[in-house]
Amino acid sequence: MKKSIFFIMTVLIVVTLVFSISYCEKVVELTFWHHEAPAHRVAAFQEVIDLFEAEHPNIKVTQEVVMWGDAWIKTIAAIEAGSGPDFQFSIPDLLLTSYLLDALLPVTDIVEELDKEYDFIDSMIAPYFHEEEYWGVPIMTMVFLLTYRPSLLEKYVGTSEPPKNWEEYLEYAKKLTDPKNNVYGIGIGGGINLMISEQAYTFMTNTGAKFFDEEGNVIFNNPKTIQAMEMYRDLFQYNPPGAEAWSWGEIELNIMAGKIAMAPYFPSVQRRFDMELDSDDYAAVAHPFPAGGKPGSITYPNEIHIYKWTAERPGHLEATYDFIRFIMRPDINYLMTAVQEPGGFYPVTVAAQEAPEFWADPIISRYEEMNRAAIEALADASLYGFEYGRWVNLGIGDITGANILAEVVNRIVAGGMTIEDAVEWGHNEMEKYSVPVGNK
């Protein structure tokens, strides 16, 4: 009898050990890169990861922050080494770099699945479509509005209502400029950096100007671009001194300080107005446009792309798909948008935009009118080089990386060139990098 009991116990122990080993072998450990370094953004990512792991105990996920300044270098190095993260949060320019190095898996199946379930905004998936495949899954997006301080408009213009067209835009900027009291009408940059490209392109959307035509030919040098640059130049005189060197941080600090009354910018200072100033004196509307122009703005969809080596790691591709499905659930996606950075990131699906969790966020609800304006503006927003629902020029990553649009602006506002000469220069520079896809 004792021998029988001993034998049974031995068998049970062996079975338990085998089961435990088998369980451990089934745990998939995913690693991904993203570029959102502020502590509250990292915390939002971790909250999502913790919730995911609670529902998927056999999948462990690790986030790694790679600063934007290092993103291209580290991505290229990982591709050359043939090993890196399972997936990466990115923007179209960086995705295109990985695509051109033949490092990506198409994600058409998961994009179509999510589109059917949650309904992607068309302009959010357009930057990722090429040769009948999607190469990135949009997760969240960013959009420019005309941000402003209502109290300053009331004081200097006599109304808290923002300008409705470019004529009023210039009138407001002039009236709002009071150097003796350290108040200026506008906050736009003049340096050679990405923010200036973002601001300048927003004006281009209002005139209908583009980098390329539908076949990918460079068409930058045209009257619509010149009209946009003229408006930028005319507004620039109402900047604070030193705006030539500004980037994102200076816009945010100066609109908080009440030094600038208006700025075409992401409505992303909500968290600071709420938590640091406890102020409602911050608003935003769709960017004004000229007579004969149209509504428009820049949007930056942020996506996930997946590397080929992920499919070679047992279980990793399936686990990555599970993670993507999880974060696209509207009851989870609000953590990636409203919680990560209210006003900085917005949902890319109709379902997530309508989710009660998003609108119940205390900061989103405090600045609800501004956030509804952002959601509405996405319908008319686009990204330079990606306006046609597919890739038309594979040189767009190099063109934006070279800050050609920003340098056009710099040459204009610094007085180094006439608008016509600067636009012609920019057109010729774009031609050097241009790789038209053609009408495929």
Question: What are the language-model segments listed below?
Answer:
Residues 172-175, 214-245, 287:
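Glycine-centered hinge/linker elements that transmit conformational signals in sensory
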